[in-house]
């Protein structure tokens, strides 16, 4: 867990997405990046909307579905 709560703003979620997309903690994790960009987009972050769309083009449909499920689960848990 990263300790980020539902009250976080879209910029925090966007930064988490970037971190996962470029692999700051090792290998890039596109599923996690998509999840955080999705959450940031839901908070109105336009750059996250763009990055999420770009990632979607690089991911399999299964990976996109998994990222969306993880975003919904994160919302449900927070």
Give short role names for the model-derived ranges.
Residues 15, 19, 51-53, 70:
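"A position-specific structural signal for the A-helix of alpha-solenoid helical repeats
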Residues 27-35, 62-68:
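Structural signature of tandem alpha-helical TPR/SEL1-like repeats
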Residues 38-40, 72-73:
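K/E-rich alpha-helical interaction surfaces of small helical-bundle regulatory domains
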Residues 45-48, 60:
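Generic structural signal for well-ordered secondary structure
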């Amino acid at each position: 867990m990263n300790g980020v709560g539902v009250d976080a703003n879209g910029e925090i979620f966007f930064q988490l997405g970037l971190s996962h997309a470029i692999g700051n903690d090792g290998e890039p994790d596109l599923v996690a990046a998509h999840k955080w960009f999705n959450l940031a987009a839901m908070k109105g972050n336009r750059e996250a909307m763009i990055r999420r769309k770009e990632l979607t083009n690089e991911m399999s449909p299964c990976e996109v579905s998994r990222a969306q499920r993880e975003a919904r689960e994160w919302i449900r848990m927070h």
